[in-house]
């Protein structure tokens, strides 16, 4: 992620220098936007990062996780407590074992049942606390995740 950011910054700097030079030399040709080709994206707010495991697919959740890195971040609510997700990965184990309980502690993290599959939360953050690994959550918040 940092490498990509650095590459984009260096490309922007080069293009900005060329664009400023062209503006000063009056070499830019202005083209009016065709509003029929324009698209609209709704405003991203804090609620955009909220997920509901029972209604969203694993793919949708991974896409939101990638899209909302940094801000607003991804979070879910359990027992009326918002919990931020800081690490996710695919689950390769027995998906049938999660039918009765939406959350299950496994070696890699916390396995969570989604609308179509299962994913694993590897790092999370409780309100006002630091980011912890799922294994730390097992030790300190095991009862919290019981249904």
Predicted regions and their residues:
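An anion-binding loop in the catalytic cleft
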Residues: 52-147
């Amino acid at each position: 992620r940092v490498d990509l950011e650095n590459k984009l910054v260096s490309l922007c700097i080069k293009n900005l220098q060329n664009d400023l030079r062209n503006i000063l030399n009056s070499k830019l040709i202005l083209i009016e936007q065709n509003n029929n080709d324009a698209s609209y994206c709704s405003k991203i707010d804090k609620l955009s990062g909220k997920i509901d495991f029972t209604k969203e697919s694993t793919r949708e959740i991974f896409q939101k996780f990638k899209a909302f890195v940094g801000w607003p971040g991804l979070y879910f609510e359990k027992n009326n407590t918002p919990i931020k997700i800081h690490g996710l990965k695919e689950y390769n184990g027995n998906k049938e074992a999660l039918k009765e309980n939406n959350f299950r502690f496994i070696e890699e993290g916390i396995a969570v049942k989604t609308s179509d599959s299962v994913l694993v939360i590897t790092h999370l953050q409780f309100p006002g606390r630091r980011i912890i690994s799922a294994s730390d959550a097992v030790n300190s918040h095991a009862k919290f995740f019981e249904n």
